[in-house]
Amino acid sequence: MKTEITVIDNGVEVTREVPIRMLLVDFIRDVVGLTGTHQGCTFEGVCGACTLHLNGEAIKSCMMLAVQADGQEITTIEGVATNGELHIVQKAFQEHHGLQCGYCTSGMIMNAVEFLRVNPNPNEKEIRHALIGNICRCTGYQNIVKAISAAAAELNDSVS
């Protein structure tokens, strides 16, 4: 059985007919064609690679049906940059080597963007706690923590 849904995806209205049991991550990747959102844990919600923003909040898209997003606003990693300019968090990950293989990176960045919106001046312990829902098998997290800390400092400088 299929149904029609409409979402605002990275600022663009998208209407598609989808199977009622299609996961949001599959809708984003296979129907919309935005492959920056990854699937890592076979739909258990533990790795965070599928993290995107739904109405401004970080969610794991492998834990939600596409039909549940009908009428909602979605932002994926492809929508974080503005006018071709990387987001401060994206730049910080690049500058502080916060990635190796890159598989977890989009989820880490999406989580970090929302985390810094809620907590703009975090300490290292708070950053590490915020990363609990995102798994990285390559980096050991140290450079990811440095990147998020640097992004927070830059965001705070830009507000001053």
Language-model segments: residues:
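Signature of N-terminal electron-transfer/Fe-S-associated modules in redox systems
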Residues: 1-160
